[in-house]
């Protein structure tokens, strides 16, 4: 299992993906609360997401940022892109991530773009294949990122050198 990344020691940038107002219906009317989905990253290979709920929007965002710092993952990169094509799944969400040539930028929509930009991936192409609910898209993207392995990791797992792998 990979080691835990301490989000408090990194210089993180945060991006609010969605804010949703939810209501609890009681005898006297509706009670409103807010949920926030936030992505944090250092644009240098570390990214995480979190959710928070509170009576007021700023409190929900603060809670989401704290949660995101606890859920950080490391993103393996090759130059400015990802090492290989991968499909991330979560619930009904499915995200296809493909490496892109240098200078092509992040071709992704909404929540996926936030995750990839804050992870520090400059060139990548993506396609949403399933549900486009923001939380499912973010979780599917993180799932795809967790599946990424660079050549050194694969060589180590197989007990070979990188040169033997690449032929």
Curated annotation (Swiss-Prot):
Pfam annotation, one family: Ribosomal_S5
Stretches that traverse the bilayer: none
Record-level GO cellular component terms: cytosolic small ribosomal subunit
Listed InterPro entries: Ribosomal_Su5_D2-typ_SF, Ribosomal_uS5, Ribosomal_uS5_bac-type, Ribosomal_uS5_C, Ribosomal_uS5_N, Ribosomal_uS5_N_CS, Ribsml_uS5_D2-typ_fold_subgr
Domain S5 DRBM: 12-75
This protein's UniProt keywords: Ribonucleoprotein, Ribosomal protein, RNA-binding, rRNA-binding
Biological process terms in GO annotation: translation
Sample GO molecular function, one term: structural constituent of ribosome
Source superkingdom: Bacteria
Comment on protein domains: The N-terminal domain interacts with the head of the 30S subunit; the C-terminal domain interacts with the body and contacts protein S4. The interaction surface between S4 and S5 is involved in control of translational fidelity.
Family: Belongs to the universal ribosomal protein uS5 family.
Function: With S4 and S12 plays an important role in translational accuracy. Located at the back of the 30S subunit body where it stabilizes the conformation of the head with respect to the body.
Subunit organization: Part of the 30S ribosomal subunit. Contacts proteins S4 and S8.
Protein name, per record: Small ribosomal subunit protein uS5
């Amino acid at each position: 299992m990979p080691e835990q990344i301490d989000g408090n020691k990194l210089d993180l940038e945060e991006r609010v993906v969605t804010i949703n107002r939810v209501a609890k219906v009681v005898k006297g009317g509706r009670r409103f609360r807010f949920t926030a989905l936030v992505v944090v990253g250092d644009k240098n290979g570390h990214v995480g997401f979190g959710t928070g709920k509170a009576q007021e929007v700023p409190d929900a965002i603060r809670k989401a940022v704290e949660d995101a710092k606890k859920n950080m993952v490391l993103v393996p990169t090759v130059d400015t892109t990802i090492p290989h094509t991968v499909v991330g799944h979560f619930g009904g969400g499915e995200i296809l991530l493909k490496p892109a040539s240098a200078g092509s930028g992040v071709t992704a929509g909404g929540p996926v773009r936030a995750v990839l930009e804050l992870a520090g991936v400059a060139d990548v192409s993506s396609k949403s294949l399933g549900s486009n609910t923001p939380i499912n898209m973010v979780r599917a993207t993180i799932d795809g990122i967790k599946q990424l392995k660079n050549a050194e990791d694969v060589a180590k797992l197989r007990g070979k050198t990188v040169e033997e792998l690449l032929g």
